[in-house]
Every structure is written in structure tokens, then in C-alpha cells.
Amino acid sequence: MSALKRMMRVSNRSLIAFIFFFSLSTSCLYFIYVAPGIANTYLFMVQARGIMLRENVKTIGHMIRLYTNKNTTLNGTDYPEGNNTSDYLVQTTTYLPQNFTYSPHLPCPEKLPYMRGFLSVNVSEISFDEVHQLFSKDSEIEPGGHWRPQDCKPRWKVAVLIPFRNRHEHLPIFFLHLIPMLQKQRLEFAFYVIEQTGTQPFNRAMLFNVGFKEAMKDRAWDCVIFHDVDHLPENDRNYYGCGEMPRHFAAKLDKYMYILPYKEFFGGVSGLTVEQFRKINGFPNAFWGWGGEDDDLWNRVHYSGYNVTRPEGDLGKYTSIPHHHRGEVQFLGRYKLLRYSKERQFIDGLNNLLYTPKILVDRLYTNISVNLMPELAPVEDY
């Protein structure tokens, strides 16, 4: 009888332990699914100490090589991903003097005296009315947020595309921060907010494709920046022009402790020339929910023969605006799609996209509303 009681006590403890671990694991899985951005941030913070240690060891070796190489300069601006020598051989940074004289007939320089470096990032909420009032004094800003310098010829005509849903508190902060920076950089630019309506999961990549097509109908842009609304640059020397290779601007996010999460990370803020974006057939349309579309874009870029460049040093630092709502659900099918990136590249992208937009032009941006559904981007078998 006593043996039976002992067995029942053991069974009860085992049952309680099983229920506890089952509840804990299901809670964790639910959290990861419904709030993947937060979950990944916490996971990355746990891993960050190990990454920082490895980076410090790498930096020591890097500095030793720089010291022993007489032909190497320290204050570089750009380095291409994937090039073995690019970690050490970088171009020097030279910014023009304050008394530099511009010419309306000559291209604007890329390194202007007004670009001082560190920016004070204020993420305090502000109303759109206040932001409109602040920029109402600037008569050179045309409807849609279009602006071009008058004292020199802009080196790039930049369309800034912003995928959007339910982030109304972020937009005014974004414009308050970005407009002065792009004006300092003497770029011609305008903003396109692509807003997803309806009940389908958020499709960031498809919104970018819609925004690209509509922006090309609006003006003759030659550079396109794909910009999350909650990322604010911390350095005005992070030049928002394009180049011979696609550009990943947001190399160091504060929510990732200013460490690149992984080599192929291409999220947050990226830029391609119009020619480059068309060559890779844009973003994939099949990623519904959180995650995967940037990794697929990275694959498309490399399959098309490009490398990715990033700002050097602290130029690529960004602050993330805090969220006051739950993020998008995780897209569980992304890994299968990523396995077939190459096969899908030219059957899913700009060339299979159908949509009906509603366009409203605000003083500071063009709003493109679109109800996205999977049947708007039919994909052939692959």
C-alpha cells in the first residue's frame, strides 16, 4: 500500500512537471509567433555578449593588420560585403570646408560641410499638425514632400518608400527627422507612404513593389530607398544616395545593440538604383507576415551578380522608435520560400504584381493605399 502511495506521489509530481513545461513551451512559442520582433530582440540581446567578444577579437586583429600595412587608411567611408580586402582597404573621408561655393550648373558634392556627423534623435511623439506647421515655412517643399536643391544639381533623385500600417504616431517623427537630413545632403527626394488596408497579414515586400511602380509613374527617379518608418539615422553622413552596388544603410540598430545580427542581414533601410531593382525583379510578393523578405532580397541581389555595401564605422547607426502595439504575426512559411529563392526570382516580384491603388497627395508625402491579397501576385509552379 505504501509503495502504491509512493508511486502516486511520483506520478503526480511528474504530471505537474509535465504540465508546467508544456505550458512554458507553448507560451514561448505563442510569444514568438505573435510578437516575433520582440522575441528576436530578446534572443539577440542574450547572444550579443558573445558576438561583442568575437568582434573585439576581430577588431584587435584588424588594427594590427592596419598598423602593419603602410598603404592603408583608417578613416574610410565604404566597404563592400563579400570582398576579402575591403575590410582593410577603404577610401578616405574628406568633407568640404564651410566656405565652399556651390554652382547650380555643377553636381552637388556627396560630402558637404553641413554634414556634421552625429544627429540628436528625438523619438518624442508629435502631431502631424505641428510637423506641417514647422515645414510650412519652407516654400521649396512641393506637394508629396518633393524637394530639390537650388544651389547645385542633385547627384541623385531619390524616392523614399515607406511601408505602412497602423503606425500613425511614427510618421510625423519620421518626417521631422528625415527631411532636414536629406536637405543637408543636397539630394532631390520625395516620400511615398504605401499603406496596406484590409485584413490580410502585413506584406512589407509587396508594398515596396507597389510603391516602386507608383513612384516611377510619378517622376523619373534613379535611386530608391526602402525605409521602415520606425528607423531613424543617427548620423547625417550616412549619405542616402545610391551606388554601383546595392546599399544597406541600417547596419547598426540600437535594438540589436548596434551589432549586425548576421552577415546577410538586409533589413531596416536599404537602397538600390532603379536599374538594379528592376534587374533583380524587385522584392518577392509571397511573404505574408513578419520575416524573410529581406533575406530573399539579399539572395536576389547576389544571384544577379551584385555585392552589398554598408556605411563604415558608426555612420550606419539607427535608433528605433518604440512601438505601442503588438507587431505582425510571424510568417512560418518563409524558410521553404527561401530555399527556392533562385527558382522564384523571376516569377515572383515586379513582373507578376496586380493591384488597384488609392492615391492621396499630402504636402509632405504621397499616400498610396492598397488592399493586398495573395491572388494579386499569382506565381507559376517552380
UniProtKB/Swiss-Prot annotation:
Bilayer topology: Single-pass type II membrane protein
Lumenal side: 36-382
SUPFAM superfamilies (alphabetical): Nucleotide-diphospho-sugar transferases (SSF53448)
Record key words, sorted: Calcium, Disulfide bond, Glycoprotein, Glycosyltransferase, Golgi apparatus, Lipid biosynthesis, Lipid metabolism, Magnesium, Manganese, Membrane, Metal-binding, Signal-anchor, Sphingolipid metabolism, Transferase, Transmembrane, Transmembrane helix
Disulfide bonds: 108-152, 223-242
Tissue/organ expression: Highest expression in brain with lower levels found in lungs, heart, skeletal muscle and kidney. Lowest expression in testis, liver and spleen.
Cell compartment(s), UniProt: Golgi apparatus, Golgi stack membrane
EC main group: transferase
Name listed for the protein in its UniProt record: Beta-1,4-galactosyltransferase 6
